[in-house]
Amino acid sequence: MKITKDEINHVAALSRLEFGEDEIDKFTEQMGDIINMAHQLAEVDTEGVPETVQVVDRETDFREDKPEHWESRAELMKNVPEKADGFIKVPVIIDKDDNE
């Protein structure tokens, strides 16, 4: 399967990323190489090889999920990069008029 520049540009637009023409050329070639490698892996004979779900024999230890009350709002807010009227200000990621 051949990856085209148009496909790379489409994915970049969906991701809201901007690249120069030289970067698009580079990514097109790299993605083509990745797809070709995946096709090669699909051809490997794995008959009789047991499935491997996780290569590390270890379980994840989760902490207890319990709410904690913050005594000091000021302590929390001192680590916030942008604030507005006592709230945490975050960047806009979805435009209201975006139809894509």
Swiss-Prot record:
SUBUNIT field: Heterotrimer of A, B and C subunits.
One GO BP annotation of this record: regulation of translational fidelity
SUPFAM superfamilies recorded: Glu-tRNAGln amidotransferase C subunit
Alphabetically ordered keywords of this record: ATP-binding, Ligase, Nucleotide-binding, Protein biosynthesis
Function: Allows the formation of correctly charged Asn-tRNA(Asn) or Gln-tRNA(Gln) through the transamidation of misacylated Asp-tRNA(Asn) or Glu-tRNA(Gln) in organisms which lack either or both of asparaginyl-tRNA or glutaminyl-tRNA synthetases. The reaction takes place in the presence of glutamine and ATP through an activated phospho-Asp-tRNA(Asn) or phospho-Glu-tRNA(Gln).
Catalytic activity entry: L-glutamyl-tRNA(Gln) + L-glutamine + ATP + H2O = L-glutaminyl-tRNA(Gln) + L-glutamate + ADP + phosphate + H(+); L-aspartyl-tRNA(Asn) + L-glutamine + ATP + H2O = L-asparaginyl-tRNA(Asn) + L-glutamate + ADP + phosphate + 2 H(+)
Pfam families: GatC (PF02686)
Molecular function (Gene Ontology), one example: asparaginyl-tRNA synthase (glutamine-hydrolyzing) activity
Similarity remark: Belongs to the GatC family.
HAMAP family: GatC
InterPro entries: Asp/Glu-ADT_sf_sub_c, GatC
Enzyme Commission number(s) from the entry: 6.3.5.-
Record-given protein name: Aspartyl/glutamyl-tRNA(Asn/Gln) amidotransferase subunit C
Keyword Lipid biosynthesis attached: no
